[in-house]
Amino acid sequence: MRILKIISLTASTIILLLVIVCAVIWTFNPLAPDVVVADPAPYGQRINDDGLIANFYPVDKPGVHPAILLLGGSEGGIGSTRMAQALQKQNYAVLALSYFGAPEQPKTLELIPLELFDQAIAWLASQPNIDGDKLAVLGTSKGAEAALIIATRHPELRAVAAGMPSSVAWQGYDPNLLKQIITPPDGSWSLKDKPIPFLPYTREYVDGPLEIYEKSLVEQSNYPEASIPIEVVGAPVLLVCGELDAIWPSCDMARQIKERATERQGPDVTVLAYEKAGHAGFGVPLETDHSRFSQLGSIGGTAEDNNFARIDSWTKTLEYLRASFEVHQEHVGN
């Protein structure tokens, strides 16, 4: 009988472990793709300057031009070539920054120094043919979280655009699942070698990435300092989100940001929420015969609905950038 009990307990333990492993595998992709550090040629150049790893896309026209710091998401490296070149064609100089994952950079999205973004903005402002009074930051997903945090520290920015944004600073992320489980990462971001306040992930059972963020946000009131202080941002803010986002509840968090800004007399916040779009609903639209078109429907919504959101939101993003820089020019002129 004792042997049967031992076998039963052992089997139960194994089943429990399998359930936990399956839940984690569903939440965090164990087969994370190789980090891409895209070749900037022929329209840009690689920057490797005192820890700054980026692709720079200058404007090939006379005069001085606005500049944009461009931030990708939790994929790491530099994979936003299409967006960078699309902005470059609109006469914006673009610095597509890698903040983790590239050679000689951290392999985990943990304790990324905010000073790195300070350095990137200073580098941009110092370049010839760039108007240092016309700077913006644009980020997607985890890069949107970073963009909003950066904006709270840089009142000189004239525009802040965030696709699939977060209203809080989150715990970090390690693509190595075993390490993620055994030694959970610290916060995503640091300042002066210390983590900034962050919202930790729930330790409850979850069924997919969306649920981990939804359950974690339930505890947000217990971590008030993790909320991004949008009220101190000095520029108008544009937020783009998909109601069917399967990664995190970007529209709920976008509305949180707008509500906080309104309650605390912060900047104007515009939310573009797309009912049928998912996490891929922001960015440069793709042609329907593009090799990656079908992937637009892999993280919420259909490929067609996500591309529709891209067509609409990208047009409005360009209008927003143009208007933000023009308003600043009018204020300077007065």
Positions of predicted regions on the chain:
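N-terminal cap/lid segment of alpha/beta-hydrolase-fold proteins
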Residues: 22-66
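Hydrolase active-site cap/lid region
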Residues: 27, 31, 149-215
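Conserved alpha/beta-hydrolase
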Residues: 88-104
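Alpha/beta-hydrolase active-site loop
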Residues: 107-128, 149
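Alpha/beta-hydrolase fold nucleophile elbow
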Residues: 129-141
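Short beta-strand/loop motif that positions the catalytic acidic residue
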Residues: 233, 239-241, 245
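C-terminal catalytic histidine-bearing segment of alpha/beta-hydrolase fold enzymes
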Residues: 255, 264-334
